[in-house]
Amino acid sequence: AEKNETHPLIRHLNEKGLAARGDENIISEARALAAKTRKGQFAPGKIIQCVEEAINLDDFDEGMKKEAEYFIECLVNPQREAMIHIFFGERAASKINDVPKETPKLDISKAGIIGSGTMGGGIAMCFANIGIPVHIVDQDEENLKKGLAAIERNYKFMVDRGRMSAEQMEKTFGLISSGLSYEEISDVDIVIEAVYENLDLKLEIFKKLDEAVKDDAILASNTSGLDVDALADCTKRPEKVVGTHFFSPANIMRLL
C-alpha cells in the first residue's frame, strides 16, 4: 500500500535542537544525572557532548564529524573492553555448563542467616529485597540489635535517596526477623553462614545446622577462601553444602 505521508531527513529536523538552545539547564542536568548514576564511566559524558553539539551547531555535517570523533574516543577507551566483558559475563553467569536446561529449580520460600555483622545483614537484605522472609541468628543479643539497626539505616538511606518508598521500606524490613537459637530456623530452605573466617568456628556451626534445620535445606557458607569440602564433610548432607561468597557490601554488589 502506498503511504501518503513523507518523512523528512534527519538533517532537516531541527525544531527540538533550536528550542533547547535557550535552556541552559538541559546539559548541566544531564551531566549531574550521569555523574550520579554512571559514576566513573567515560561514554555517558561523550553521549551528552554529542547532544550538546546537536543543540548548538548549525551545520549538520559538522555535527556528524563531532559524533564520529567522540565515538572513536569511546572506542579506544579502556572502559570499552571492560564494559563488553561485563555485559557478556553477566549473561554467561546464569548458564552453568553440564547442567541441563530442564533441571528443576529449588523453591526458596524462607532463608536463615548465621551472623548479624556487615555481611550477614547485607545478605539478609538481599533476600528481603526480593520478597523472601529471612531470619538472622546470632549468639550475642547486643550484636543482633546493632545488626538490625544497621539494616534499618541502610533502608532509610534508600528512602532518603528516593530508591524506595517509606511503605516499601516498612514491608521489606518487616520480612527480616532475628533470634538467638538455631531452632528458630528449623524450617528454612537455605541457611547462609556469615561469620568471620575461622574454620573451626564454621565447622562447629555447620554441625549444629545439620542437626537443627530440615534435611533437604541447603547449608551455605559465605567463606572467601576456606575449604567448603571440609564443611560439607562434617555434615550428613554433603551434597547440600555450597559456597556462596557475596561481595561486600552484599546488598549493593551484584557479584556472588
Language model features with spans:
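NAD(P)+-binding Rossmann beta1-loop-alpha1 motif at the extreme N-terminus of oxidoreductases
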Residues: 93-154, 177, 212
